[in-house]
Amino acid sequence: RGSNLTSLPLQNVIDLFYVGNITIG
């Protein structure tokens, strides 16, 4: 997780969804 993602709202949402998807299984 780089600081670059923080500056990109869309990328941040995608990253959050990606992490959430892994957590769910």
Curated annotation (Swiss-Prot):
Tissue: Expressed in chorionic epithelium (trophectoderm).
Protein's UniProt name: Pregnancy-associated glycoprotein 72
Subcellular location: Secreted, Extracellular space
Protein's UniProt keywords contain Hydrolase: yes
Protein family per UniProt: Belongs to the peptidase A1 family.
Glycan-bearing residues: N4, N21
KW Glycoprotein (keyword) present: yes
